[in-house]
Amino acid sequence: MTPLRKTNPLMKLINHSLIDLPAPSNISMWWNFGSLLGTCLILQIITGLFLAMHYAPDASTAFSSVAHITRDVNYGWIIRHLHANGASMFFICLFLHIGRGLYYGSFLYLETWNIGIILLFATMATAFMGYVLPWGQMSFWGATVITNLLSAVPYIGTDLVQWVWGGYSVDNATLTRFFTFHFILPFIITTLATLHLLFLHETGSNNPLGISSQPDKITFHPYYTIKDILGLFLLLLILMSLVLFAPDLLGDPDNYIQANPLNTPPHIKPEWYFLFAYAILRSVPNKLGGVLALLLSILILVAIPTLHVAKQQSMMFRPLSQLTYWLLVTDLLTLTWIGGQPVSYPFITIGQVASVLYFTTILILMPIASLIENKMLKWT
């Protein structure tokens, strides 16, 4: 008798995506992050839903409502810290997922890669708006500084900023609309993630060797479900350790002070996962130039498939390309560190050097390394 999962239309869909899905037999733990990102998204939606039940999106009560959730709501403290630190875990998985795509050449699956970039933008927008909601000092001033960047747009900049703010400054209207978008975007992200999977299953997964997986495939269940569950346990171990032992480790102490438009914090900075882009923004003395550099630091991912001139898909057997890749990783870590430092010597200079190196590595060094390797292998 044919199992129900192969006959029922809905079960058949799940079966083809998660159970009988043909997967390459040699994919490593770096392929775990897709399922971990899905888990993070579900966790964020569930915890966010419970937080929204008690949160008040109003400038006069937002800060107090967050304190109320932490103090008075049953297990409110753990829901809040799971949501805040869950976002950090989300971005860690996201960066590792993109890093794996770059290293093993998964960007050659264009539709999947491009939807992934849209997903990254949507996730960054959601996280930014979520950071504004507690209405602490860093929430308020972070929102003011980042939204103010729109004023760099020629001619319509000022109108654009006031349109986003809903007034002449970040105020109640801004908070209300940010809460609205913060609530709706995760569902849009879920739809995009489904499309991401749909396009991935059209081509099948890449593998570490960067060769065709067609001759040697195994079913996703039980082999990779077990492997993914191990990754999930490790993720939950790190997340719960953070939540239970150091819930405020990745946050900013200034956010425990209620938003005050008359008092600017000594050093305004976004959450840690935006610091690399923030460092690039600050490295350009011109406002419009800084905004363009900020946008290009993410949009450059769109150009990666075009810049791929190597004859091999994966970097596994390309030592020169590996060198440029790890240079890029080190550079991004340096930018993240610089983004959290005050705007003074020597941090300004280090930030500028690291910003130039970031674009140089992707646009010049990586393609040159690939061409040299092609030449050495007589594949030109």
Swiss-Prot record:
One of its GO terms (biological process) is mitochondrial electron transport, ubiquinol to cytochrome c. SUPFAM superfamilies: a domain/subunit of cytochrome bc1 complex (Ubiquinol-cytochrome c reductase), Transmembrane di-heme cytochromes. It comes from the Eukaryota. Pfam families: Cytochrom_B_C (PF00032), Cytochrome_B (PF00033). It is found in: Mitochondrion inner membrane. CDD domains: cytochrome_b_C, Cytochrome_b_N. Heme b b566 binds at H97, H196. Heme b b562 binds at H83, H182. A ubiquinone binds at H201. GO terms for cellular component: mitochondrial inner membrane; respiratory chain complex III. Binds 2 heme b groups non-covalently. The chain crosses the membrane at residues 33-53, 77-98, 113-133, 178-198, 226-246, 288-308, 320-340, 347-367. InterPro entries: Cyt_b/b6_C, Cyt_b/b6_C_sf, Cyt_b/b6_N, Cytb/b6-like_sf, Cytochrome_b, Cytochrome_b_C_euk/bac, Cytochrome_b_N_euk/bac, Di-haem_cyt_TM. The keyword Membrane applies. It is a multi-pass membrane protein. Its cofactor is heme b. One of its GO terms (molecular function) is metal ion binding. Keywords: Electron transport, Heme, Iron, Membrane, Metal-binding, Mitochondrion, Mitochondrion inner membrane, Respiratory chain, Transmembrane, Transmembrane helix, Transport, Ubiquinone. The cytochrome bc1 complex contains 11 subunits: 3 respiratory subunits (MT-CYB, CYC1 and UQCRFS1), 2 core proteins (UQCRC1 and UQCRC2) and 6 low-molecular weight proteins (UQCRH/QCR6, UQCRB/QCR7, UQCRQ/QCR8, UQCR10/QCR9, UQCR11/QCR10 and a cleavage product of UQCRFS1). This cytochrome bc1 complex then forms a dimer. Heme 1 (or BL or b562) is low-potential and absorbs at about 562 nm, and heme 2 (or BH or b566) is high-potential and absorbs at about 566 nm. Component of the ubiquinol-cytochrome c reductase complex (complex III or cytochrome b-c1 complex) that is part of the mitochondrial respiratory chain. The b-c1 complex mediates electron transfer from ubiquinol to cytochrome c. Contributes to the generation of a proton gradient across the mitochondrial membrane that is then used for ATP synthesis. Belongs to the cytochrome b family. This is Cytochrome b. The lineage of its organism: Eukaryota, Metazoa, Chordata, Craniata, Vertebrata.
